[in-house]
Amino acid sequence: MLTTMRRHGIRLALFAILATALTAIVHQLTTRTIAHQAALQQQRLFDQVIAPDGYDNDLQRSCLLLRDPRLGDSSAHRLYLAQRQGQPIAALVETTAPDGYAGAIRLLVGADFSGKVLGVRVQEQHETPGLGDKIEIRISDWIDSFRNKVVHGAQDPAFRVKKDGGEFDQFTGATITPRAVVNAVRRTTLAIRDIRPHLASLPRCGESK
Protein backbone atom coordinates (compact mmCIF):
# COMPACT_ATOMS: atom_id res chain seq x y z
CA MET A 1 0.00 0.00 0.00
CA LEU A 2 2.72 2.45 1.04
CA THR A 3 4.82 1.47 -1.98
CA THR A 4 1.90 2.18 -4.30
CA MET A 5 1.30 5.54 -2.66
CA ARG A 6 4.98 6.43 -2.99
CA ARG A 7 4.88 5.55 -6.67
CA HIS A 8 1.83 7.74 -7.20
CA GLY A 9 3.48 10.54 -5.25
CA ILE A 10 6.65 10.32 -7.33
CA ARG A 11 4.64 10.30 -10.54
CA LEU A 12 2.66 13.34 -9.45
CA ALA A 13 5.84 15.15 -8.45
CA LEU A 14 7.49 14.37 -11.78
CA PHE A 15 4.38 15.48 -13.64
CA ALA A 16 4.31 18.75 -11.70
CA ILE A 17 8.00 19.36 -12.43
CA LEU A 18 7.55 18.64 -16.14
CA ALA A 19 4.44 20.82 -16.34
CA THR A 20 6.21 23.70 -14.61
CA ALA A 21 9.25 23.37 -16.87
CA LEU A 22 7.08 23.25 -19.99
CA THR A 23 5.12 26.31 -18.87
CA ALA A 24 8.36 28.21 -18.24
CA ILE A 25 9.73 27.29 -21.67
CA VAL A 26 6.52 28.31 -23.44
CA HIS A 27 6.42 31.58 -21.50
CA GLN A 28 10.03 32.36 -22.40
CA LEU A 29 9.48 31.61 -26.08
CA THR A 30 6.28 33.67 -26.15
CA THR A 31 7.96 36.60 -24.41
CA ARG A 32 10.82 36.55 -26.92
CA THR A 33 8.39 36.42 -29.84
CA ILE A 34 6.35 39.33 -28.50
CA ALA A 35 9.50 41.39 -27.88
CA HIS A 36 10.79 40.60 -31.38
CA GLN A 37 7.51 41.63 -33.01
CA ALA A 38 7.39 44.83 -30.95
CA ALA A 39 10.93 45.69 -32.06
CA LEU A 40 10.04 45.09 -35.72
CA GLN A 41 6.94 47.26 -35.41
CA GLN A 42 8.93 50.04 -33.76
CA GLN A 43 11.59 49.92 -36.49
CA ARG A 44 8.91 50.13 -39.18
CA LEU A 45 7.61 53.28 -37.48
CA PHE A 46 11.13 54.73 -37.33
CA ASP A 47 11.57 54.04 -41.05
CA GLN A 48 8.48 56.14 -41.79
CA VAL A 49 9.92 59.09 -39.88
CA ILE A 50 13.60 59.02 -40.90
CA ALA A 51 15.16 57.43 -43.97
CA PRO A 52 16.98 54.20 -42.96
CA ASP A 53 19.96 55.07 -45.16
CA GLY A 54 20.40 58.40 -43.41
CA TYR A 55 22.08 56.93 -40.32
CA ASP A 56 24.24 53.93 -39.46
CA ASN A 57 23.57 53.17 -35.79
CA ASP A 58 20.90 51.07 -34.03
CA LEU A 59 18.19 53.57 -33.11
CA GLN A 60 16.47 51.24 -30.68
CA ARG A 61 19.71 50.93 -28.70
CA SER A 62 20.35 54.67 -28.81
CA CYS A 63 17.54 55.75 -26.50
CA LEU A 64 17.91 58.73 -24.18
CA LEU A 65 15.47 60.47 -21.84
CA LEU A 66 14.57 64.11 -22.37
CA ARG A 67 12.56 66.38 -20.10
CA ASP A 68 11.36 69.57 -21.74
CA PRO A 69 7.99 71.31 -21.22
CA ARG A 70 7.84 71.84 -24.98
CA LEU A 71 7.20 68.09 -25.28
CA GLY A 72 3.74 68.54 -23.80
CA ASP A 73 4.22 67.60 -20.15
CA SER A 74 6.83 67.31 -17.41
CA SER A 75 7.56 63.59 -17.83
CA ALA A 76 10.70 62.10 -19.38
CA HIS A 77 10.23 61.47 -23.11
CA ARG A 78 12.18 58.95 -25.16
CA LEU A 79 14.68 60.41 -27.63
CA TYR A 80 16.21 58.08 -30.22
CA LEU A 81 19.52 59.49 -31.44
CA ALA A 82 20.42 58.95 -35.10
CA GLN A 83 24.15 58.99 -35.86
CA ARG A 84 26.41 58.65 -38.86
CA GLN A 85 30.00 57.56 -38.30
CA GLY A 86 29.58 58.30 -34.61
CA GLN A 87 28.28 61.84 -35.08
CA PRO A 88 24.74 62.84 -34.03
CA ILE A 89 22.74 63.97 -37.05
CA ALA A 90 19.10 63.84 -35.94
CA ALA A 91 16.71 62.64 -33.26
CA LEU A 92 13.30 61.03 -33.02
CA VAL A 93 11.30 62.09 -29.98
CA GLU A 94 8.11 60.66 -28.51
CA THR A 95 6.17 63.82 -27.77
CA THR A 96 2.66 64.91 -26.79
CA ALA A 97 0.16 67.40 -28.13
CA PRO A 98 -1.79 67.96 -24.90
CA ASP A 99 -4.54 70.06 -26.47
CA GLY A 100 -6.19 67.73 -28.97
CA TYR A 101 -9.96 67.89 -29.33
CA ALA A 102 -10.41 64.58 -27.49
CA GLY A 103 -7.37 64.73 -25.25
CA ALA A 104 -3.65 64.26 -25.62
CA ILE A 105 -2.22 63.09 -28.95
CA ARG A 106 1.00 61.08 -28.81
CA LEU A 107 3.41 61.70 -31.69
CA LEU A 108 6.80 60.57 -32.93
CA VAL A 109 8.65 63.56 -34.38
CA GLY A 110 11.96 63.29 -36.22
CA ALA A 111 14.12 66.34 -36.88
CA ASP A 112 17.74 67.24 -37.47
CA PHE A 113 19.65 69.69 -35.30
CA SER A 114 19.14 72.63 -37.64
CA GLY A 115 15.37 72.70 -37.12
CA LYS A 116 14.31 70.69 -40.17
CA VAL A 117 11.49 68.20 -39.70
CA LEU A 118 12.29 64.78 -41.16
CA GLY A 119 8.95 63.14 -40.49
CA VAL A 120 6.02 62.76 -38.10
CA ARG A 121 3.75 59.88 -37.17
CA VAL A 122 0.84 59.55 -34.75
CA GLN A 123 1.36 56.94 -32.04
CA GLU A 124 -1.93 57.35 -30.19
CA GLN A 125 -4.99 59.54 -30.62
CA HIS A 126 -8.68 59.58 -29.71
CA GLU A 127 -9.89 62.25 -32.12
CA THR A 128 -13.31 62.23 -33.81
CA PRO A 129 -13.57 59.54 -36.52
CA GLY A 130 -13.99 61.08 -39.96
CA LEU A 131 -12.76 64.48 -38.77
CA GLY A 132 -9.75 64.75 -36.48
CA ASP A 133 -8.47 61.27 -37.22
CA LYS A 134 -7.18 62.51 -40.59
CA ILE A 135 -3.88 63.03 -38.78
CA GLU A 136 -3.39 59.26 -39.16
CA ILE A 137 -1.34 58.25 -42.21
CA ARG A 138 -3.72 55.33 -42.88
CA ILE A 139 -6.52 57.85 -43.43
CA SER A 140 -4.80 60.78 -45.16
CA ASP A 141 -1.32 61.97 -46.10
CA TRP A 142 -1.74 65.24 -44.18
CA ILE A 143 0.88 64.21 -41.60
CA ASP A 144 3.50 64.07 -44.37
CA SER A 145 3.10 67.81 -45.01
CA PHE A 146 5.66 68.40 -42.24
CA ARG A 147 8.45 66.57 -44.05
CA ASN A 148 11.48 68.79 -44.81
CA LYS A 149 9.82 71.90 -43.37
CA VAL A 150 12.14 74.09 -41.28
CA VAL A 151 11.06 75.69 -38.00
CA HIS A 152 12.55 79.17 -37.69
CA GLY A 153 11.56 79.85 -34.11
CA ALA A 154 8.85 79.60 -31.49
CA GLN A 155 6.80 82.28 -33.25
CA ASP A 156 7.40 81.04 -36.80
CA PRO A 157 4.30 82.36 -38.63
CA ALA A 158 4.46 79.61 -41.24
CA PHE A 159 4.21 76.84 -38.64
CA ARG A 160 0.51 77.32 -38.03
CA VAL A 161 -2.68 76.11 -39.68
CA LYS A 162 -3.93 78.29 -42.53
CA LYS A 163 -6.80 79.58 -40.41
CA ASP A 164 -4.16 81.12 -38.14
CA GLY A 165 -2.13 82.49 -41.06
CA GLY A 166 0.24 79.56 -41.51
CA GLU A 167 1.02 76.98 -44.20
CA PHE A 168 -0.73 73.87 -42.91
CA ASP A 169 -4.22 72.81 -43.91
CA GLN A 170 -6.87 72.40 -41.27
CA PHE A 171 -9.66 69.85 -41.68
CA THR A 172 -13.23 70.74 -42.57
CA GLY A 173 -15.09 70.82 -39.26
CA ALA A 174 -11.96 70.05 -37.27
CA THR A 175 -9.42 72.81 -36.70
CA ILE A 176 -8.45 72.01 -33.11
CA THR A 177 -6.80 68.68 -33.93
CA PRO A 178 -4.44 69.83 -36.72
CA ARG A 179 -3.65 73.02 -34.78
CA ALA A 180 -2.60 70.93 -31.78
CA VAL A 181 -0.39 68.70 -33.93
CA VAL A 182 1.24 71.61 -35.80
CA ASN A 183 2.03 73.36 -32.53
CA ALA A 184 3.44 70.17 -31.00
CA VAL A 185 5.65 69.49 -34.03
CA ARG A 186 6.97 73.06 -33.94
CA ARG A 187 7.77 72.90 -30.22
CA THR A 188 9.32 69.44 -30.43
CA THR A 189 11.51 70.34 -33.40
CA LEU A 190 12.87 73.31 -31.46
CA ALA A 191 13.50 71.08 -28.44
CA ILE A 192 15.50 68.71 -30.67
CA ARG A 193 17.45 71.61 -32.18
CA ASP A 194 18.31 73.03 -28.77
CA ILE A 195 19.35 69.74 -27.12
CA ARG A 196 22.29 69.10 -29.48
CA PRO A 197 24.98 70.59 -27.16
CA HIS A 198 23.56 68.75 -24.14
CA LEU A 199 23.15 65.20 -25.48
CA ALA A 200 25.98 63.82 -23.34
CA SER A 201 24.16 64.89 -20.17
CA LEU A 202 20.94 62.99 -20.95
CA PRO A 203 20.34 59.70 -19.10
CA ARG A 204 19.91 56.56 -21.13
CA CYS A 205 16.53 54.84 -21.18
CA GLY A 206 16.28 52.59 -18.15
CA GLU A 207 18.40 54.90 -16.03
CA SER A 208 17.22 57.58 -13.66
CA LYS A 209 18.77 60.97 -13.24
Curated annotation (Swiss-Prot):
Q: Which cofactor does it need?
A: FMN
FMN phosphoryl threonine: modified positions: 175
Q: Does the keyword Ribonucleoprotein apply?
A: no
Cite the InterPro entries for this sequence: FMN-bd (IPR007329), Ion_transpt_RnfG/RsxG (IPR010209)
Q: What are the subcellular locations of this protein?
A: Cell inner membrane
Membrane-crossing ranges are 9-29
List this protein's GO terms for biological process.
electron transport chain
Keywords, alphabetical:
Cell inner membrane, Cell membrane, Electron transport, Flavoprotein, FMN, Membrane, Phosphoprotein, Translocase, Transmembrane, Transmembrane helix, Transport
Judging by the UniProt lineage, the source's domain of life is Bacteria
What GO terms fall under cellular component here? plasma membrane
Enzyme class at the top of the EC tree: translocase
Q: How does it sit in the membrane?
A: Single-pass membrane protein
The molecular function terms of the Gene Ontology recorded here are:
electron transfer activity; FMN binding
What are its E.C. numbers? 7.-.-.-
Q: What does this protein do?
A: Part of a membrane-bound complex that couples electron transfer with translocation of ions across the membrane.
User: Which family does the entry's similarity section mention?
Assistant: Belongs to the RnfG family.
What does the subunit section of this Swiss-Prot or TrEMBL entry state?
The complex is composed of six subunits: RnfA, RnfB, RnfC, RnfD, RnfE and RnfG.
Please report the name of this protein according to its UniProt entry.
Ion-translocating oxidoreductase complex subunit G
